[in-house]
């Protein structure tokens, strides 16, 4: 957890070991930091500017993106079966996870926008038109076009 606190008396910075004379300081991992000293070990972004959360593992202090990139759980896209990096934005339908580019009707390839209605039938993502056409067929066995 990261917190910004007004400085009441000078404290030593865990990053540079110098006294913190700034008006504000950061407290993270039960240590005090200059705003410029608390950085992600990978991308060097200032963690006080990124948000109020930081991640630690293997003696590294990391931003969310780099933590997920290095240690996050990845999975495979339900449509293309390719690996989805842990930091990538995804779409979900029940237990299935998809790349944003793969989240489309699996019969006509119509891409979905936020708020569009879609259907999951026999583990396939379908647009409303293809879903309704499939319901009209006996036994519903869609053929990929």
Swiss-Prot record:
The keyword Metal-binding applies. InterPro entries: LMO_RBTN_TF (IPR050945), Znf_LIM (IPR001781). It comes from the Eukaryota. Keywords: LIM domain, Metal-binding, Repeat, Transcription, Transcription regulation, Zinc. Residues 11-73, 75-137 form the LIM zinc-binding domain. GO terms for biological process: negative regulation of ERK1 and ERK2 cascade; positive regulation of fat cell differentiation; positive regulation of nuclear receptor-mediated glucocorticoid signaling pathway; positive regulation of peroxisome proliferator activated receptor signaling pathway; positive regulation of transcription by RNA polymerase II. One of its GO terms (molecular function) is metal ion binding. One of its GO terms (cellular component) is cytoplasm. It holds the Pfam family LIM. The keyword Transcription applies. This is LIM domain only protein 3.
């Amino acid at each position: 957890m990261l917190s910004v606190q007004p400085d009441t008396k000078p404290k030593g910075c865990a990053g540079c070991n110098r006294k913190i004379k700034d008006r504000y300081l950061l407290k993270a991992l039960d240590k005090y930091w200059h705003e410029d000293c608390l950085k992600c070990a990978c991308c060097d972004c200032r963690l006080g500017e990124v948000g109020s959360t930081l991640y630690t593992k293997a003696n590294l202090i990391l931003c969310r993106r780099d933590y997920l990139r290095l240690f996050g759980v990845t999975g495979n896209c339900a449509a293309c079966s390719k690996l989805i990096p842990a930091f990538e934005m995804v779409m979900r339908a029940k237990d299935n996870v998809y790349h944003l580019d793969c989240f489309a009707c699996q019969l006509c390839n119509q891409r979905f926008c936020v708020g569009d209605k879609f259907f999951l039938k026999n583990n396939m993502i379908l647009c409303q038109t293809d879903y309704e056409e499939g319901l009209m067929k006996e036994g519903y066995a869609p053929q990929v076009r």
